[in-house]
């Protein structure tokens, strides 16, 4: 009896409403409650990198003669579902909705505060 080979299931890409430069709050995980600016989005992986959140340490070997190794601390990515857009004026996290203006342009708006993001 032959065994079937299994392929790694590709994650479905979700529509990300978070962009680089947005302020977000972490809503799940070890850094729950922390806020920070989005440094980078990884839409194909459904992940974001937030400033000062989910810090990881990495050991680097010396690359050149006479150089010493070092320990580097950097931000690791978080899943996009674990962060929520944050209003710095009202100090509250909120879901986001897409609003179509009369001229046909799309804007992002926080549901709790009504604040327009772009």
Curated annotation (Swiss-Prot):
PROSITE patterns referenced in this protein's UniProt entry, alphabetically: RIBOSOMAL_L24 (PS01108)
GO biological-process terms attached to the record: translation
An MF annotation (GO) of this entry: rRNA binding
Keywords annotated in UniProt: Ribonucleoprotein, Ribosomal protein, RNA-binding, rRNA-binding
Pfam families: KOW (PF00467), ribosomal_L24 (PF17136)
Cystine bridges: none
HAMAP family: Ribosomal_uL24_B
NCBIfam families: rplX_bact
Purpose of the protein: One of two assembly initiator proteins, it binds directly to the 5'-end of the 23S rRNA, where it nucleates assembly of the 50S subunit.
Protein name from the UniProt record: Large ribosomal subunit protein uL24
Gene for this chain: rplX
């Amino acid at each position: 009896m032959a065994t079937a080979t299994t392929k790694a299931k590709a994650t479905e890409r979700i529509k990300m409403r978070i962009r680089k430069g947005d302020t977000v709050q972490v809503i799940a995980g070890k850094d729950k409650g922390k806020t920070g600016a989005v440094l980078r989005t990884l839409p194909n992986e459904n992940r974001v990198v937030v400033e000062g959140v989910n810090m990881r340490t990495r050991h680097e070997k010396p690359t050149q003669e006479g150089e010493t190794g070092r320990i580097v601390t950097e931000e690791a990515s978080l899943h996009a579902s674990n962060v929520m857009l944050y209003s710095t004026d009202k100090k509250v996290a909120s879901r986001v909705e897409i609003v179509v203006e009369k001229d046909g342009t799309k804007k992002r708006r926080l549901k709790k505060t009504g604040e327009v993001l772009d």
